Amino acid sequence: MPRRRVVATREILPDPKFGSQTIAKFINHVMVDGKKSTAERIVYGALEQVAEKRNIEDPVAFFEEVLENVRPMVEVKARRVGGATYQVPMEVRPSRRTALAMRWLADAASKRSEKSMAHRLAGELGDASEGKGSAVKKRDEVHRMADANKAFSHYRF
């Protein structure tokens, strides 16, 4: 085992509008080139649009629900055994689940065709809440890969 000390996880400051660490983390995922105020405007605008469209009182709870729809439970990792590389299904730890869900939501939103990023993000959040959209599709694809490679689960690390 390495003798280095364990690195402490950084405490992320909650976002100014909702006081939520989850939304602050998502703003950081949406941010490009260090432009945080632009990313905040995009995320808050998207949450407002979705709240208006669907008559939602608590956008933070809605966002948590969307994240839960996108979070992967299992993923595949490459494992080399005797010259062959196997895709071994592994359970995803909670912090990585959330990080992957946020990354997939941000990527899926940026690939949509609406005019502004706030509109794209609002559309993707709406679709993800209904269990459709590119981010949910990505999660299902990862789950399918893990299911297809279930035979190699005895190679776990």
UniProtKB/Swiss-Prot annotation:
Protein name: Small ribosomal subunit protein uS7
GO cellular component terms given for this protein: small ribosomal subunit
Function: One of the primary rRNA binding proteins, it binds directly to 16S rRNA where it nucleates assembly of the head domain of the 30S subunit. Is located at the subunit interface close to the decoding center, probably blocks exit of the E-site tRNA.
NCBIfam families: rpsG_bact
Keyword ATP-binding: no
GO biological process: translation
Protein's UniProt keywords contain Ribosomal protein: yes
Oligomeric and partner information: Part of the 30S ribosomal subunit. Contacts proteins S9 and S11.
Gene that this sequence comes from: rpsG
Family statement drawn from the similarity comment of this UniProt entry: Belongs to the universal ribosomal protein uS7 family.
Signal peptide start and end residues: none
Alphabetized Pfam families for the sequence: Ribosomal_S7 (PF00177)
Entry-linked PROSITE patterns: RIBOSOMAL_S7
